[in-house]
UniProtKB/Swiss-Prot annotation:
One of its GO terms (molecular function) is RNA binding. It comes from Arabidopsis thaliana. GO terms for cellular component: mitochondrion. Belongs to the PPR family. PCMP-E subfamily. This is Pentatricopeptide repeat-containing protein At1g26900, mitochondrial. PROSITE patterns: PPR. GO terms for biological process: RNA modification. PPR repeats lie at residues 89-123, 124-158, 159-189, 191-225, 226-260, 261-291, 292-326, 327-361, 362-392, 393-427, 430-460, 466-496. It is found in: Mitochondrion. The keyword Transmembrane does not apply. InterPro entries: Pentatricopeptide_rpt, PPR_At4g14850-like_plant, TPR-like_helical_dom_sf. It holds the Pfam family PPR. Residues 1-117 form a transit peptide. NCBIfam families: PPR.
Length: 572
């Protein structure tokens, strides 16, 4: 009933709009047609100049149309027009809010909304929907909650599309309970978009079971299941890894009659791949009447994740036979799997196919190639690919530095890291970059370089070291017989020392049998109130390695006891 009314209203709206446009002057009609064909700001500005020359810039309808088209192409140009309009109306304000909501400056929509309220114009639901879109993009919880309150007091919450926008806003901002509250307050005015939005919100916070419960509620309601809702449903099944659930979901798609939709076919292939039904995924793929590159990529990716790399290569050749042009995404997952399994032959075959297809070497694909070649032992090829890359991101640099380190070329790894800092101001090293450099220094015995890198990580980039970073530094100094230097380094860090660093050092003391330093570290942990029974056992082991069995026993008995673990079996 609701759908029929909505459809009738939409037809009436289109009919009235066409009637309205037919009543416009030929000059105005030509203006609208010209604006529809505009592709850039230059063309819009020419029409704007024509309007000023002919006096159409005083016509509210013509100016509204100019704003509507220019706000999509260039919001700043639209803003310059809007600022000079003396008689702004609600449509113009909504147009500007919408323009900002899809621009690079979504936060400016808030000031336009405030201007709209200050002018005293009557708001409509689109004023809220477009402003909420900006709130979602900027994660502005307080502003979004304020809009919710205004909409509630103004009586706009009866509109389903506004409620859907609110649910989306709360989901994006991680306030899933508030999103559910809005949903529960609208039992009679929900549609498929409402269910899909909230289901996606549950999936974002890893609450797959609640997403499935919501789908069951939808099935019991009068709301018709659509492709978007089914995609969310299949995603939840995939994340749960339930093969029997996947088969039931597949049957449901067939019953509803949407199993031939290309998006659903791709989702079904991915679902079966993730739930262990790779043969079922292949059957769906083979039976698909129509396939696009995304469908091919999905099947190849599922084979790659399952370790069936030869099947991936066969599919790549089949793509070429069927004249389906692959893209960079076709190769990325497969190359990563080759790197993980150290499958050099398959990796080179894939790389050769990539060369044949002349796929552009972007940052993601280039990084996958560098990583694959480095991990299968072909470092020279990795360097060649890295040097060919025009666009390199932090992952590209990190992959190449890691490759040097894995091949024992610590000096080259440090040199490349320094080059990254010097030549690429836009590329900022991350915690993983520092970890691979520290690891290379540790295995290469570059003590000074490693310490300098660690200090830069903390002092220049303000990263908080993790246990892996501390482990590399302690191992680096330990291999050089400089555990005391490691002690001083941790003690003098410009950040508040935590137990992670001291425990890494305590473990190193046990390896190298430095009992005195181990006692000092234990005292530090005690001063911090971070002692644990396992620390006493580590110290006991340190004394044992140092040849002090008495102290080893004393430490274990008196300084701490570790509770015994146990297993339990419940018997009915």
């Amino acid at each position: 009933m609701t759908l029929a009314i909505t459809s009738r209203l939409r037809r009436n709206f289109v009919f009235r709009r066409r009637n309205l446009e037919s009543l416009l002057s030929p000059q105005c009609q030509k203006l609208i047609n010209d604006l529809r064909s505009c592709r850039d700001t230059v063309e819009v500005s020419r029409i704007h100049g024509y309007m000023v020359k002919t006096g159409l810039d005083k016509d509210d309808f013509a100016v509204s149309k100019l704003l509507a088209f220019s706000s999509v192409l260039d919001i700043r140009y639209a803003s310059s027009i809007f600022e000079h309009v003396s008689n702004t109306n609600l449509f113009m304000f909504n147009t500007m809010i919408r323009g900002y909501s899809i621009s690079d400056e979504p936060e400016r929509a808030f000031s336009v909304f405030n201007q709209l309220r200050a002018k005293g114009l009557t708001l409509d639901r689109f004023s809220f929907i477009t402003t909420l879109k900006s709130c979602s993009r900027e994660l502005c919880v307080s502003i979004g909650e304020g809009l919710h309150g205004i909409a509630l007091r103004s009586g706009f919450m009866v509109f389903t599309d506004l409620r859907n926008a609110l649910i989306h806003f709360y989901c994006v901002c991680g306030k899933i309970s508030d999103a559910r509250k809005v949903f529960d307050e609208m039992p009679q005015s929900v549609d498929a978009v409402t269910f899909s939005t909230l289901m996606n919100g549950y999936l974002q916070v890893s609450k797959k079971a609640l997403a499935l419960d919501l789908f069951r509620i939808m099935r019991k309601s009068e709301v018709v299941v659509n492709v978007s809702t089914l995609l969310s449903f299949l995603s939840a099944i995939s994340d749960l890894g339930d093969l029997s659930g996947a088969e039931s979901a597949h049957v449901l798609c067939i019953k509803i009659g949407l199993d031939l939709d290309l998006h659903l076919i791709t989702a079904l292939i991915g679902m079966y791949g993730k739930t262990g039904g790779i043969s079922s995924a292949r059957r769906i793929f083979d039976c698909a009447i129509r396939k696009d590159v995304v469908t091919w990529n999905c099947m190849i990716d599922q084979y790659a994740k399952t370790g069936l790399l030869e099947e991936c290569v066969w599919l790549l050749r089949q793509m070429k036979y069927e004249k389906m042009k692959p893209n960079s995404s076709t190769f990325v997952g497969l190359l990563s799997s080759c790197a993980y399994s150290e499958a050099a032959f398959v990796g080179r075959t894939v790389a050769d196919l990539l060369e044949e297809e002349r796929i552009a070497l972007d940052a993601i694909l280039g990084t996958a190639l560098v990583d694959m070649y480095a991990k299968v032992g072909l470092l020279e090829k990795a360097v060649e690919i890295f040097n060919r890359m025009k666009d390199k991101d932090v992952k590209s640099w990190t992959a190449m530095i890691s490759g040097y380190g894995a091949h024992g070329l610590a000096r080259e790894a440090v040199t490349l890291f320094n080059k990254m800092e010097e030549e690429n101001c836009k590329v900022r090293p991350n915690e993983i970059t520092f970890l691979v450099v520290l690891n290379a220094c540790s295995h290469g015995g570059l003590v000074m370089e490693g310490i300098r890198c660690f200090k830069r990580m903390v002092e220049a980039y303000s990263f908080t070291p993790k246990v892996e970073h501390y482990g590399c530094v302690v191992d680096l100094l330990g291999r050089a017989g400089q555990l005391e230097e490691a002690y001083e380094l941790i003690r003098n860090l410009p950040i508040t020392s935590d137990s992670t660093a001291w425990r890494a050092l305590l473990a190193a003391c046990r390896v190298y049998g430095n009992a005195d330093l181990g006692e000092s570290v234990m005292m530090r942990l005690a001063e911090m109130g971070e002692t644990h029974p396992a620390d006493a056992i580590l110290l006991a082991g340190t004394h044992a390695v140092a040849g002090n069995p008495e102290k080893s026993l004393d430490n274990e008995l008196n300084k701490g006891r570790k509770e015994a673990g146990y297993s339990a079996i419940e018997i009915e």
